[in-house]
Amino acid sequence: LLVGGTGLLGGRVAAALAEAGVDLRVVVRPGRDGQALSALGAQLCTGDLRDPASLSAACAGIDTVVTTANVIGRHLKGDREVGSIADVDRAGNAALITAAETAGCRRFVFISLPEALQRSGAPFAEAKHATEERLRASSIQSVVVRSDAFQELWFSKDVGFDWRAGRAIVLGKGRARQRFVAVDDVARAMAALAVAPDPPALLEIGGPDALSPYDAMAIFTAVTGRAFRVVRVPRPVLLVASQTLGRVDPIRGSLVRMSLAADEADSVCRVEDLTSLGIRPRSVEEYARLLSHATT
């Protein structure tokens, strides 16, 4: 069973599972387009993390549950029907685990965040932490995948990185290094863990290069020939913004708080947790070349 299959990561997990010949059922929220999933051969069932009864029906007869669902991606795309962090990422995930336990599911694969972000005080990160704790207390075999930042998200205009125009917003000092990872690589990892005979309980996966935002800009400049104009947002401004936004918009407030946490120290995610699964991770330079070639 896959929950979150219409999202950025979930759609790629579905494709990887289908390619491996796995019998797949996907939970699709009412009103969402599941044609691409049907084309993969997946069985669709209507459900919502806010509707425990629908989750019980979805889990019936299932061996393994994989979930990538969250409210942030949909919210940033303008979907105001997706629900809140409290209802979906905290209570919804807890309800899904309960449904899986009741149905006798054997394994639960969950996408999470690095531990440093879980300690950020961001509501979204706290929901991830609560779900990890709930899984640890469960009788189900759990596999937690803590992923570093997605290349497709962090090197996009959505977060102020406009490589075409040569403009970038740097939050905080911009010195801490992350292992920016391809969504496809994370998806292939989750698909592999869903069917592995004896998977590890925890993986902390990242890309092959430890890079600061300035390092990443240098790579894009070398590939595209475009220098960057940088707008830096100081940490005190971010702190005030996180407190102000957190009161009116917990989702955007969470993003700012997690950005503050990521700016404090280098990521502990490991490329070895990808390569151990037989995955050759895509580098940031490869991604920059891919984007550059797509526009020529």
Annotate the PLM regions:
Residues 28-102, 117:
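NAD(P)H-binding glycine-rich loop region in Rossmannoid oxidoreductase-like domains
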